[in-house]
Amino acid sequence: MKKIIFTGGGSAGHVTPNLAIINELNDKDWSIAYIGSYEGIERQLVEKAGIRYFGISSGKLRRYMDWKNVTDIARIANGFRQARKILKAEKPDVVFSKGGFVTVPVVAAAYTLRIPVHLHESDLTPGLANRLAKRFANTFYTSFAETAAHFPKEATTTVGSPIRRELLEGSRIQGLTITDFSRERPTLLVMGGSLGAKRINEAIRESLDTLTNTYQIIHICGKGHLDPALEGRRNYKQYEYVHDELPHFLQAADLVVTRGGSNAIFEFLALHIPMLIIPLSRAQSRGDQILNAQTFVKNGYARMLEEENLTKETLQQEVQELYNGRQTYIEAMNASQATNAVAYITEKLEQEVQ
């Protein structure tokens, strides 16, 4: 039996593309396992999918001087030893890495054991983890064509983002039934990512009096960010996090307000949902979400509102502009060349072990 180990973590965006590929490999006689951190969100998502999971020590390397770098280097070194032990025992034919700091010791360990590594980069510019990991990998995939310049030309293919099959198979009627929403009123989906988005949550809730006059709102606000005072509010449903309901909510959505994580926005592109992207600011990130958003705006798939300019007034204005021009955005997405990367990547993995 062919064997593969996946790695990736830190946020759902580093995990769900792996799950999309795993779903396909499950039908192709593969033995599958996953290496992630002890307590990261990846553990919850992977174990829920019924995949064997190995936790290792993980640390974050920062782009600035910090004493935590010293202790985190020790954690990464320990993670390398743990990953190497797991790989020696499991003897996978190939490792697939999706990014996040937990992946660095895993792909380094695979390199020392001469196990081929396939690596996918979702963002327009690679994160630090993938910049470190690329020296240990053999095959590279990117979501954006521009990203390929950061990896070896002969070993890199632009494939788009791996999208879970089930996300494309939801039911609009079921989504509206779950929320008890009307079929006649437009539905606005708000997603701040698996960890939530405080500023977006605040702006949405400050705008409810205005927005709910036009829209019914599905607000996925992140763990610990529910507002009990808003339970039972007309045309408004809030959720910390959703899993089984998500495909149905996506089909029910006429518009989406979202962060600029690559995997999420490629999912909305595949579903042809007009987007208002509010990327993480440069003060909170390396600016990758801003670049992702700018590319989608340039291609006509989305509008963008920088977090520094986010108020209830600017949010309401941008949502209305998006709704007014929704058909233009849908037509641009219909004409896009974006494809689901899952089929291509699974074929390459099959070829790797032949």
Swiss-Prot record:
UDP-N-acetyl-alpha-D-glucosamine binds at S11, A12, G13, R164, S194, Q289. Transmembrane segments: none annotated. One of its GO terms (biological process) is cell division. Its EC number is 2.4.1.227. The keyword Glycosyltransferase applies. It comes from the Bacteria. It is a peripheral membrane protein. InterPro entries: GlcNAc_MurG (IPR006009), Glyco_trans_28_C (IPR007235), GlycoTrans_28_N (IPR004276). Keywords: Cell cycle, Cell division, Cell membrane, Cell shape, Cell wall biogenesis/degradation, Glycosyltransferase, Membrane, Peptidoglycan synthesis, Transferase. Pathway: Cell wall biogenesis; peptidoglycan biosynthesis. Its main location: membrane. It is found in: Cell membrane. GO terms for cellular component: plasma membrane. It catalyses: di-trans,octa-cis-undecaprenyl diphospho-N-acetyl-alpha-D-muramoyl-L-alanyl-D-glutamyl-meso-2,6-diaminopimeloyl-D-alanyl-D-alanine + UDP-N-acetyl-alpha-D-glucosamine = di-trans,octa-cis-undecaprenyl diphospho-[N-acetyl-alpha-D-glucosaminyl-(1->4)]-N-acetyl-alpha-D-muramoyl-L-alanyl-D-glutamyl-meso-2,6-diaminopimeloyl-D-alanyl-D-alanine + UDP + H(+). Pfam families: Glyco_tran_28_C, Glyco_transf_28. GO terms for molecular function: UDP-N-acetyl-D-glucosamine:N-acetylmuramoyl-L-alanyl-D-glutamyl-meso-2,6-diaminopimelyl-D-alanyl-D-alanine-diphosphoundecaprenol 4-beta-N-acetylglucosaminlytransferase activity; undecaprenyldiphospho-muramoylpentapeptide beta-N-acetylglucosaminyltransferase activity. Belongs to the glycosyltransferase 28 family. MurG subfamily. Cell wall formation. Catalyzes the transfer of a GlcNAc subunit on undecaprenyl-pyrophosphoryl-MurNAc-pentapeptide (lipid intermediate I) to form undecaprenyl-pyrophosphoryl-MurNAc-(pentapeptide)GlcNAc (lipid intermediate II). This is UDP-N-acetylglucosamine--N-acetylmuramyl-(pentapeptide) pyrophosphoryl-undecaprenol N-acetylglucosamine transferase. The gene is murG.
